[in-house]
Curated annotation (Swiss-Prot):
Keyword Mitochondrion: yes
Chain ranges for the short sequence motif Nuclear localization signal 2 as given in the UniProt record: 709-715
Reaction catalysed by this enzyme: L-tyrosyl-[protein] + ATP = O-phospho-L-tyrosyl-[protein] + ADP + H(+)
Keywords assigned by UniProt, alphabetized: Acetylation, Apoptosis, ATP-binding, Autophagy, Cell adhesion, Chromosomal rearrangement, Cytoplasm, Cytoskeleton, Disease variant, DNA damage, DNA repair, DNA-binding, Endocytosis, Kinase, Lipoprotein, Magnesium, Manganese, Membrane, Metal-binding, Mitochondrion, Myristate, Nucleotide-binding, Nucleus, Phosphoprotein, Proto-oncogene, SH2 domain, SH3 domain, Transferase, Tyrosine-protein kinase, Ubl conjugation
Recorded disease: Leukemia, chronic myeloid: A clonal myeloproliferative disorder of a pluripotent stem cell with a specific cytogenetic abnormality, the Philadelphia chromosome (Ph), involving myeloid, erythroid, megakaryocytic, B-lymphoid, and sometimes T-lymphoid cells, but not marrow fibroblasts.
Positions of post-translational Phosphotyrosine modification: Y70, Y115, Y128, Y139, Y172, Y185, Y215, Y226, Y253, Y257, Y393, Y413
Record lineage: Eukaryota, Metazoa, Chordata, Craniata, Vertebrata
Ranges where the SH3 domain occurs: 61-121
Residues at the catalytic site: D363 (proton acceptor)
Compartments (UniProt record): Cytoplasm, Cytoskeleton; Nucleus; Mitochondrion
N6-acetyllysine: residues carrying this PTM: K711
Binding site for ATP: 248-256, 271, 316-322
Name recorded for this polypeptide: Tyrosine-protein kinase ABL1
Gene: ABL1
């Protein structure tokens, strides 16, 4: 600045300026100068230039000469009051450098180090803001006028400076370049030696800028003072120093009050500890964490009172309370997109700091962030924070966590890392984008984890720019290692809108330029009614909604969709269509992202849809089973798959009643979200496939949706991501074979399987991996037409089953499945069948095996009889399965473990434990006991092996050729078909077993069906209360003994399978007895692992019995058994 003033005065040397330079400066700034500067602009520049040059003088190079940046009022302890712009000489610093002793003309004392700066630094200028992000600059200028500006240093590129200038409601950013000779310039024609000269020049002449630099943006927030006094090196405070005022809120462990620290007349926040809520040590851990962290966006600890109860934690006071309530109650025209992005950037900066300090927060959410003046946001509530000594932190048993904000690996394994905080940050970002909406609207807590497993993710909020939503989705990657770090997130915010402004992006998303206030309006009451109306329409025209909804939704809010948005908007509508069952169509608003509609309304719609959906889901399944004529049933199922894939309960949930519920409840809200997501994010070819399965109108709508599906995320946020072809076959096979209870279970697995092929990350998928493999084979590996065939076949099977009564249907359905099985070569057929069976039956191995030789004989007789449509479809499926065994095997090998990849450590430990096993004798006894408890797997396996040799085989083979090709095409490829056969009966599970190699036992027609039903029913009928912890533990011991015996004798592979089947059956029944949600999640994951391991053993029995290979397979099995045992014993 001094140089500028000298230039104005006409001096060529600093020394030429006398001690009365201030007079010269003011005169020079007020005096007209012969130049092309405008007098008005010069006078405006003088208003802020003259003050900043008050300290300029001969002593400018003195390193101890500083200038005050902010006002500071002394509060005792030898502190010194200073005013902005005042000169002072620094005499020394305290032990931590946070306070410095200074001398002014008013005296000597301590002042905060971050309140002063060297007199020759840029920070002394009101227009220089130091390291400030692009987003923060836009925020700081958001309330300015034309000509408001600031100069900032790039946070991402230190040393690189820019000018941010506001004009006509928009902020323009100009990079300050450095020439080879060291001179600075914005416009190459005008170069300057110093930054101050450059700023002064552009304050008088635009010279390439949109307008002149008139008004420096104020530095709004004073920096945090760490510690209330320079001598304050102990944290314990006197309780009498705090005056408690009114209550601000409460939490799990205590309450928060506003108080006054009398000694310093400072308003503070006082967090108290409830009596008997946790130990003092735990309470003090939070204070210990806060002592170690110092960041402008982290709430600062001031002291503690722990000498006697009640205990206090005293922190700085934030004027506007928690971020969640602030967002819900704020004026949305004031708290616009720029402010929201600024808030998110501040939080990411705080979390980046914690990441570098190796801290994890473990409770990051809008409710735990606080808001101060000028939209300052600080992360607070470190009650669950921990200093990391390794890559992960394991929470103690019984710890409580917010499910909707907790990463899946944390829910399943109690493992926390900075990556689990990243997941929570994604949810927090969604909260900010929706002005404080509750995450996963309409979805029950118990369903969140299952939906996430199925690759469901929340929809993009209305008006949310694509880049921001992509960042959310990146935070929600299933594998923790795939999520970005907070450093990357912060950098993403800094560079997110380099070529445009967020305001413009939001306007584009809303579909109307200049409608800035529309967002807040849309989010309010009117939306709810709209959603209701939408849902009604969707329900009334569910069959036709798929096609009309897309245009309809667009019409509502997308009247002027952007050219780049068409793909997105259709996707959103599609999602809405998915929800039609439960009123999901209400999501049409979501579809009009481009329109005014808000994410809130769409989510609310989904919620409403949820209530109707559960009933529809369950009713549709029942009707399908009992009413063959209901053609709509098939269509509904197809929709359910797309919408309700999420809804399907995991195989883990043994309770039949439970499985329907999840499918309903989850399916509706999730389905809505999912379908929309599915349509939006799925690829067009997948949509086409699915369309074939569903009614023609559905197909049309889906195809359209596929075309418009969103660009970046192939999978929808929801489970709907499952390939359509796969999903269709899956739901059919599942629904057909089992009653509602079993159906829910099987359905779930198959659906997941379909997902899995496309989305390897999904954990649940392993449970249905086999099934998924089958589905994927039909849909992915073969041409799309294969998928169609499968779909058609499934329809036929469905019809047959529905038409025939439980008694009559078995003969027709059974004979053909049996024939197919027989047709498969004994040796090769078994593996293929097993693969097919895997998907259909978890533990169905027993069901398949249960088919006795007698039943085989029975089947042989009926096998010769005329084939019903169901039989033919089954035969075709069987044929397809035999043809694609290689493919199936490959897929099986690729299957990922169901649980999230979270803590690798847990898996390693489990793997190591498998080596330990009880004595062989004990194992033998345990095996026997297990056999008595459930259908004997050994017999089933043996019978399966023997079956191929039986004459029934020959019959079966002829049957395959006899079936017309067109029909076989319909069933194309899903080995699942056997499962569908028993759909009307509980024996559905047995049908699944039939898919396995043991399926050769299917020779008996009616008798087989009966035996299968019996085999499957016992596990299904077991009341959850009947299976106790002891039963499960005994079963795990039995399996360990069987494995130990097998490893030594290299025999009795079937005994291991049988023991595993028994354990699986008991676990599925026991899962509902687990009360703690987190343990239930982990137990389901363990069941999925067990199921996958058993399938692998069934598919490749040879490897299990061959030396090292067998050991490896059993190691995985033992690992899952150990995990189950650990969870049960918690």
């Amino acid at each position: 600045m001094l140089e500028i003033c000298l230039k104005l005065v006409g001096c060529k040397s600093k020394k030429g300026l006398s001690s009365s330079s201030s007079c010269y400066l003011e005169e020079a700034l007020q005096r007209p100068v012969a130049s092309d500067f405008e007098p008005q602009g010069l006078s405006e520049a003088a208003r802020w230039n003259s003050k900043e040059n008050l300290l300029a003088g001969p002593s400018e190079n003195d390193p101890n000469l500083f200038v005050a940046l902010y006002d500071f009022v002394a509060s005792g302890d030898n502190t010194l009051s200073i005013t902005k712009g005042e000169k002072l000489r620094v005499l020394g610093y305290n032990h931590n450098g946070e306070w410095c002793e200074a001398q002014t003309k008013n005296g000597q004392g301590w002042v905060p180090s971050n309140y002063i700066t060297p007199v020759n630094s840029l920070e002394k200028h009101s227009w220089y803001h130091g390291p400030v992000s692009r987003n923060a600059a836009e925020y700081l200028l958001s309330s300015g006028i034309n000509g408001s500006f600031l100069v900032r240093e790039s946070e991402s590129s230190p040393g690189q400076r820019s000018i941010s200038l506001r004009y006509e409601g928009r902020v323009y950013h100009y990079r300050i370049n450095t020439a080879s000779d060291g001179k600075l310039y914005v416009s190459s024609e005008s170069r300057f030696n110093t930054l101050a000269e450059l700023v002064h020049h552009h304050s008088t002449v635009a010279d390439g800028l949109i307008t002149t630099l008139h008004y420096p943006a104020p530095k709004r927030n004073k920096p945090t003072v760490y510690g209330v006094s320079p001598n304050y090196d102990k944290w314990e405070m006197e309780r009498t120093d705090i005056t408690m005022k009114h209550k601000l809120g409460g939490g799990q462990y205590g309450e928060v009050y506003e108080g006054v620290w009398k000694k310093y007349s400072l308003t503070v926040a006082v967090k108290t500890l409830k009596e008997d809520t946790m130990e003092v040590e735990e309470f003090l851990k939070e204070a210990a964490v806060m002592k170690e962290i110092k960041h402008p966006n982290l709430v600062q600890l001031l002291g503690v009172c722990t000498r006697e109860p009640p205990f206090y934690i005293i922190t700085e006071f934030m004027t506007y309370g928690n971020l969640l309530d602030y967002l819900r109650e704020c004026n949305r025209q004031e708290v616009n997109a720029v402010v929201l992005l600024y808030m998110a950037t501040q939080i990411s900066s705080a979390m980046e700091y914690l990441e570098k300090k190796n801290f994890i927060h473990r409770d990051l959410a809008a409710r735990n962030c606080l808001v101060g003046e000028n939209h300052l946001v600080k992360v607070a509530d470190f009650g669950l924070s921990r200093l990391m000594t390794g890559d992960t932190y394991t929470a103690h048993a019984g710890a409580k966590f917010p499910i909707k904000w907790t990463a899946p690996e944390s829910l399943a394994y109690n493992k926390f890392s900075i990556k689990s905080d990243v997941w929570a940050f994604g949810v927090l970002l969604w909260e900010i984008a929706t002005y404080g909406m509750s995450p996963y609207p309409g979805i029950d807590l118990s369903q969140v984890y299952e939906l996430l497993e199925k690759d469901y993710r929340m929809e993009r909020p209305e008006g949310c720019p694509e880049k921001v939503y992509e960042l959310m989705r990146a935070c929600w990657q299933w594998n923790p290692s795939d999520r970005p770090s907070f450093a990357e997130i912060h950098q993403a915010f800094e560079t997110m809108f380099q070529e445009s402004s967020i305001s413009d992006e939001v306007e584009k998303e809303l579909g109307k330029q200049g409608v800035r206030g529309a967002v807040s309006t849309l989010l309010q009451a009117p939306e709810l009614p709209t959603k209701t109306r939408t849902s009604r329409r969707a329900a009334e025209h569910r069959d036709t909604t798929d096609v009309p909804e897309m245009p309809h939704s667009k019409g509502q809010g997308e009247s002027d969709p952007l050219d780049h948005e068409p793909a997105v908007s259709p996707l959103l509508p599609r999602k809405e269509r998915g929800p039609p069952e439960g009123g999901l169509n209400e999501d049409e608003r979501l579809l009009p992202k481009d329109k005014k509609t808000n994410l809130f309304s769409a989510l609310i719609k989904k919620k409403k849809k949820t209530a109707p959906t559960p009933p529809k889901r369950s009713s549709s399944f029942r009707e399908m089973d009992g009413q063959p004529e209901r053609r709509g049933a098939g269509e509904e199922e197809g929709r359910d798959i797309s919408n309700g894939a999420l809804a399907f309960t995991p195989l883990d949930t043994a309770d039949p009643a439970k499985s329907p519920k999840p499918s309903n409840g989850a399916g509706v809200p999730n389905g809505a979200l999912r379908e929309s997501g599915g349509s939006g994010f799925r690829s067009p070819h997948l949509w086409k496939k699915s369309s074939t399965l569903t009614s023609s109108r559905l197909a049309t709508g889906e195809e359209e949706g596929g075309g418009s599906s969103s660009k970046r995320f192939l999978r929808s946020c929801s489970a709907s991501c499952v390939p359509h072809g796969a999903k269709d076959t899956e739901w059919r096979s599942v629904t057909l074979p089992r009653d509602l209870q079993s159906t829910g279970r099987q359905f779930d697995s198959s659906t997941f399987g379909g997902h899995k092929s496309e989305k390897p990350a999904l954990p649940r998928k392993r449970a249905g991996e086999n099934r998924s493999d089958q589905v994927t084979r039909g849909t992915v590996t073969p041409p799309p037409r294969l998928v169609k065939k499968n779909e058609e076949a499934a329809d036929e099977v469905f019809k047959d089953i529905m038409e025939s009564s439980p008694g009559s249907s078995p003969p027709n359905l059974t004979p053909k499945p049996l024939r197919r099985q027989v047709t498969v070569a004994p040796a090769s057929g078994l593996p293929h069948k097993e693969e097919a069976g895997k998907g259909s039956a978890l533990g169905t191995p027993a069901a398949a095996e249960p088919v006795t030789p007698t039943s085989k004989a029975g089947s042989g007789a009926p096998g010769g009889t005329s084939k019903g449509p169901a039989e033919e479809s089954r035969v075709r499926r069987h044929k397809h399965s035999s043809e694609s065994p290689g493919r199936d095997k490959g897929k099986l090998s690729r299957l990922k473990p169901a649980p999230p990849p979270p803590p690798a450590a847990s898996a390693g430990k489990a793997g190591g434990k498998p080596s330990q096993s009880p004595s062989q004798e004990a194992a033998g006894e345990a095996v026997l006991g297990a056999k008595t408890k459930a259908t004997s797997l050994v017999d089933a396996v043996n019978s399966d092996a023997a079956k191929p040799s039986q004459p029934g085989e020959g019959l079966k083979k002829p049957v395959l050729p006899a079936t017309p090709k067109p029909q076989s095409a319909k069933p194309s490829g899903t080995p699942i078909s056997p499962a569908p056969v028993p759909s009307t009966l509980p024996s559905a599970s047995s049908a699944l077993a039939g898919d396995q190699p043991s399926s050769t036992a299917f020779i008996p027609l009616i008798s087989t069906r009966v035996s299968l039903r019996k085999t499957r029913q016992p596990p299904e009928r077991i009341a959850s209360g009947a299976i106790t912890k002891g039963v499960v533990l005994d079963s795990t011991e039995a399996l360990c003994l069987a494995i130990s015996r097998n490893s030594e004798q290299m025999a009795s592979h079937s005994a291991v399978l049988e023991a595993g089947k028994n354990l699986y059956t008991f676990c599925v029944s026991y899962v509902d007895s687990i009360q703690q949600m987190r343990n239930k999640f982990a137990f389901r994951e363990a069941i999925n692992k067990l199921e996958n391991n058993l399938r692998e053993l069934q598919i490749c029995p040879a490897t299990a019995g061959s030396g090292p290979a067998a050991t490896q397979d059993f190691s995985k099995l033992l690992s899952s058994v150990k995990e189950i045992s650990d969870i049960v014993q918690r």
